[in-house]
Amino acid sequence: MNAPTERPETSVDPKLLEILVCPLTKGPLEFDSAKQELISRSAKLAYPIRDGIPIMLPEEARKID
């Protein structure tokens, strides 16, 4: 019998990435699978993904360098 292969969400639907933008700059976002975040390079913010749901609130975002 095979062991379960289920694991936490590790990717974002590419179609979702096409339509999501940074709420501050309206620029594109990049998915960081290791940290489960959507990165806005132009705003220097990382938006968390919790339970597979992107949290697109600037006050919830982490500042990045």
Swiss-Prot record:
InterPro entries: Trm112-like (IPR005651)
Annotated Pfam families: Trm112p (PF03966)
Any one Gene Ontology cellular component term annotated for this protein: cytosol
Residue ranges that the Swiss-Prot or TrEMBL entry lists as coiled coil: none
Domain of life from the UniProt record: Bacteria
Family: Belongs to the UPF0434 family.
Protein name: UPF0434 protein bsr0601
Organism of origin: Bradyrhizobium diazoefficiens (strain JCM 10833 / BCRC 13528 / IAM 13628 / NBRC 14792 / USDA 110)
